[in-house]
């Protein structure tokens, strides 16, 4: 209803700007059939992604064997933009991608981002580190706390 009214106002304003001055002495002509507006519904017909599909999509993204440093950073930047803390399996895949690229700095930065995304919920980051501990040990990645970066 509001959208239709706004479209009519826009068409009337456009017609008024093309036709010249209007007022009591120069009434606006009635809109013809060319000015008729169809009501359009603006929905997204896409399906909604489940949590499992979301996780699988990101794990697949980071598990690409030919991922490069730019794609890794782009993926992490996009992932950080969401209003969530990534699941440990997504972070695991991202850390393994860092290892394939020999990018230790990005691996540590990923862990810093996870801590930052956890925000005031102090129980989330230790849980994620606990879940990732076998991967961190296997890949030789130190946490920011082990490196002393939390004190800087």
Curated annotation (Swiss-Prot):
Pathway: Energy metabolism; oxidative phosphorylation. The keyword Mitochondrion applies. InterPro entries: Cyt_c_oxidase_su5A/6, Cyt_c_oxidase_su5A/6_sf. It comes from the Eukaryota. The modification Phosphothreonine is found at residue 143. Its main location: mitochondrion. The modification N6-acetyllysine is found at residues 89, 115. One of its GO terms (molecular function) is metal ion binding. GO terms for cellular component: mitochondrial inner membrane; respiratory chain complex IV. Disulfide bonds: none annotated. This is Cytochrome c oxidase subunit 5A, mitochondrial. PANTHER family: CYTOCHROME C OXIDASE POLYPEPTIDE (PTHR14200), CYTOCHROME C OXIDASE SUBUNIT 5A, MITOCHONDRIAL (PTHR14200:SF16).
């Amino acid at each position: 209803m509001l959208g239709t009214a706004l479209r009519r106002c826009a068409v009337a304003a456009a017609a008024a700007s093309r036709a010249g001055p209007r007022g009591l002495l120069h009434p606006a002509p009635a809109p013809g059939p060319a000015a008729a507006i169809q009501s359009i519904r603006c929905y997204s017909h896409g399906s909604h992604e489940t949590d499992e599909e979301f996780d699988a999509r990101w794990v697949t993204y980071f598990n690409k064997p030919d991922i490069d440093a730019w794609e890794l950073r782009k993926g992490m930047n996009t992932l950080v933009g969401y209003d969530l803390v990534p699941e440990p399996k997504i972070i695991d895949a991202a850390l393994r991608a860092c290892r394939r690229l020999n990018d230790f700095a990005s691996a540590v930065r990923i862990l810093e981002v996870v801590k930052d995304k956890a925000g005031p919920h102090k129980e989330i980051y230790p849980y994620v580190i606990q879940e990732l501990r076998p991967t961190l040990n296997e890949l030789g990645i130190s946490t920011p706390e082990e490196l002393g970066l939390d004190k800087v």
